[in-house]
C-alpha cells in the first residue's frame, strides 16, 4: 500500500492496545452509560410483542418485525458514528476516537441483541459479541474460514439449549483478538484520521465499519 511508508511502525501496536483498553473499560464501567442512550426495557417489551405476533400470525411480516427493529437501531447508530468519526477527523483525532468508536459499535450490537431477545451482561455473552465484531472485520478467505467456525459454534450453542453455560471463555483473550482484527482493518483510516488536514477522510470510514459489524450481528 502506498501509505505504508508514511505510517509509523509502532502504530499497529498502539491501535491494538487502544482498542483492547477501550473494550475493557466499556465492559467494566461503560455499559450503564451506553444503556442510557436507549430504552432497554422498551426493547425487551418489543421483542416479547414481536415474538407473540410471530407465534399467532405465523407469517413473514411478523418475523420481519425483529429485523425491522434491529435495522431502526442500526440507522441511528450509523448517524452517531458519522458525526463522531468526521467530527474528530476534522481536528485530527485518530487514536482518541477509538474509545468512542468502540462504544458506538457495542451500542449497535447491544441493540441488535435486544431486538432478538438476547442480553449482553455475562462474560459468555460479551465474548460472543466480541467474536461477532472480530469475524465481521475479516476479508475474503479469512472471513470464510472464521465465519464457518463461528457458525459451527453457534450451531453447538443452539443444540445445547441456546446457552453458553459451561463453555470455556477467556474474555481478555477475545478482547485482544477483536482488537487486533479491528486495528489491522482500520490501520490506514485511523492514520488518516489522525492527520489534521485530511482527518475527515479517515473519519468517513467509521460508519462504514459500524454498518459492516451491525449487518453481521443481525445475521448472527
Model-predicted regions and their roles:
Residues 1-83, 110-220:
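Terminal, membrane-proximal amphipathic helices
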Amino acid at each position: 500500500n502506498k501509505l505504508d511508508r508514511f505510517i509509523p511502525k509502532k502504530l499497529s501496536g498502539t491501535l491494538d492496545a487502544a482498542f483492547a483498553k477501550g473494550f475493557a473499560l466499556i465492559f467494566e464501567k461503560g455499559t450503564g452509560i451506553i444503556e442510557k442512550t436507549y430504552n432497554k426495557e422498551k426493547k425487551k417489551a418489543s421483542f416479547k410483542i414481536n415474538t407473540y405476533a410471530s407465534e399467532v400470525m405465523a407469517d413473514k411480516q411478523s418475523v420481519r418485525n425483529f429485523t425491522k427493529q434491529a435495522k431502526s437501531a442500526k440507522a441511528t447508530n450509523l448517524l452517531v458514528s458519522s458525526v463522531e468519526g468526521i467530527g474528530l477527523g476534522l481536528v485530527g483525532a485518530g487514536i482518541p476516537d477509538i474509545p468512542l468508536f468502540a462504544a458506538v459499535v457495542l451500542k449497535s450490537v447491544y441493540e441488535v441483541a435486544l431486538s432478538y431477545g438476547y442480553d449482553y451482561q455475562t462474560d459468555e455473552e460479551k465474548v460472543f459479541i466480541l467474536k461477532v465484531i472480530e469475524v465481521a472485520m475479516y476479508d475474503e478467505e479469512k472471513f470464510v474460514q472464521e465465519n464457518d467456525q463461528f457458525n459451527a459454534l453457534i450451531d453447538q450453542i443452539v443444540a445445547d439449549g441456546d446457552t453458553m453455560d459451561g463453555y470455556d471463555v477467556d474474555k481478555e483473550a477475545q478482547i485482544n483478538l477483536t482488537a487486533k482484527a479491528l486495528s489491522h482493518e482500520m490501520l490506514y483510516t485511523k492514520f488518516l484520521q489522525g492527520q489534521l488536514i485530511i482527518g475527515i477522510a479517515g473519519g468517513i470510514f467509521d460508519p462504514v465499519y459500524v454498518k459492516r459489524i451491525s449487518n453481521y450481528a443481525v445475521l448472527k
